[in-house]
């Protein structure tokens, strides 16, 4: 049992070790498979790549980089010891924030790109290019790495109590929260969450408004249904994965800086923190769903793959059937010849 003292409030948070171990194991398996398949499709299957594909490739790479660090986290939360050194601890922490806010920003890029394509299809042609998409992706990487870097400087391994085990990902001192981390939280919440949230909701609303205009009613009903599904899936995944954690992170920083001192509030916030963090980490498994609903090219490629497999199976069965038919006729002919020779 682990009891933590936050000023004068005592609470138990030992459940987080089991929770993290189980959740990270599941995310590692599902995230590794789904994102490897996604990158394979992007690189080896897709013949035509557009600006949306560029954003999705970068999102998949971000997810995969984080997934590769999960075995170290799983080992730590299972054994409660970090034997991998201070540098790997820092890298793991940095990749966590890089992945989370990189995912948020890349999903926002996809949302803005869809908004421009549907609301301003002609005016946005000069903006929606692969070259500009690569520039935007470079800007996103620089932003999330720059925003995550300060956390690396304050994160380090330390000994736990009287035993020889090393700790990583554990609580920072209140002094560190008051001097550094509270400012980092303000920056990443504004740049990495609230602005993207506003952009996602605004862009999705504008797209829905455009689709309901009389001018667009003549569009194919199937295409409009696809866009509506795309928006619905996109917003559900965004809100489910990122809203709980980022709202709780604000409250958590207020608790750690002792702005909130009520013990019931402190216990509730610190209990919800590992739960919302696990939900946020699950975005690695849900992002491939966004790829499928966002890109017609991916859907068509998967359908073509399935069709080619079925067609090859059909051709094989045809050839195999023809061979059996020929062999049967030959056997019948041989039998007749043998019977005639015997009769003679």
UniProtKB/Swiss-Prot annotation:
Keywords: Cell membrane, Disease variant, Disulfide bond, G-protein coupled receptor, Glycoprotein, Hypotrichosis, Lipoprotein, Membrane, Palmitate, Receptor, Transducer, Transmembrane, Transmembrane helix. InterPro entries: GPCR_Rhodpsn, GPCR_Rhodpsn_7TM. Glycans are attached at residue 5. Changing residue 278 to Y: In ARWH1; loss of G protein-coupled receptor signaling; reduced localization to cell membrane; decreased protein abundance; increased protein degradation. It is a multi-pass membrane protein. Coiled coil: none annotated. It comes from the Eukaryota. Residues 1-19, 80-92, 155-181, 254-272 are extracellular. Signal peptide: none annotated. GO terms for molecular function: lysophosphatidic acid receptor activity. PANTHER family: G-PROTEIN COUPLED RECEPTOR (PTHR24232), LYSOPHOSPHATIDIC ACID RECEPTOR 6 (PTHR24232:SF3). This is Lysophosphatidic acid receptor 6. The lineage of its organism: Eukaryota, Metazoa, Chordata, Craniata, Vertebrata.
């Amino acid at each position: 049992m682990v009891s933590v003292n936050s000023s004068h409030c005592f609470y138990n948070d030992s459940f987080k070790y089991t929770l993290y171990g189980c959740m990270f194991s599941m995310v590692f398996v599902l995230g590794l498979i789904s994102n490897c398949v996604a990158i394979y499709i992007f690189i080896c299957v897709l013949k035509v790549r557009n600006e949306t594909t560029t954003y999705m490739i970068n999102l998949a790479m971000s997810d995969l980089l984080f997934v590769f660090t999960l075995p170290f986290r799983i080992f730590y939360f299972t054994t409660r010891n970090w034997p991998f050194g201070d540098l790997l601890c820092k890298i793991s922490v940095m990749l966590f924030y890089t992945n989370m806010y990189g995912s948020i920003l890349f999903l926002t890029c996809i949302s803005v790109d869809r908004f421009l394509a549907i609301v301003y299809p002609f005016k946005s042609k000069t903006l929606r290019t692969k070259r500009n998409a690569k520039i935007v992706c470079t800007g996103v990487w620089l932003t999330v790495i720059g925003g995550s870097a300060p956390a690396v400087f304050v994160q380090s391994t330390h000994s736990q109590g009287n035993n020889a085990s090393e700790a990583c990902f554990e609580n920072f001192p209140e002094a560190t929260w008051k001097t550094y981390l509270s400012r980092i939280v303000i920056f990443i919440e504004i740049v990495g969450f609230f602005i993207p949230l506003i952009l996602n909701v605004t862009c999705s609303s504008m797209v829905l408004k455009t689709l309901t205009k009389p001018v667009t009613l003549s569009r194919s009903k199937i295409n409009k249904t696809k866009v509506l599904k795309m928006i619905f899936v996109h917003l559900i995944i965004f809100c489910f994965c990122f809203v709980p954690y980022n709202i709780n992170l604000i409250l958590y920083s207020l608790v750690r800086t002792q702005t909130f001192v009520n013990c019931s509030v402190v216990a509730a916030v610190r209990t919800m923190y590992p739960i919302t963090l696990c939900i946020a980490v699950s975005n690695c498994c849900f992002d491939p769903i966004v790829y499928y609903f966002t890109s017609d090219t991916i859907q068509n490629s998967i359908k073509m793959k399935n069709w080619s497999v079925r067609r090859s199976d059909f051709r094989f069965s045809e050839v195999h059937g023809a061979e059996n038919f020929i062999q049967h006729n030959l056997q019948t002919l041989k039998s007749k010849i043998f019977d005639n020779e015997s009769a003679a």
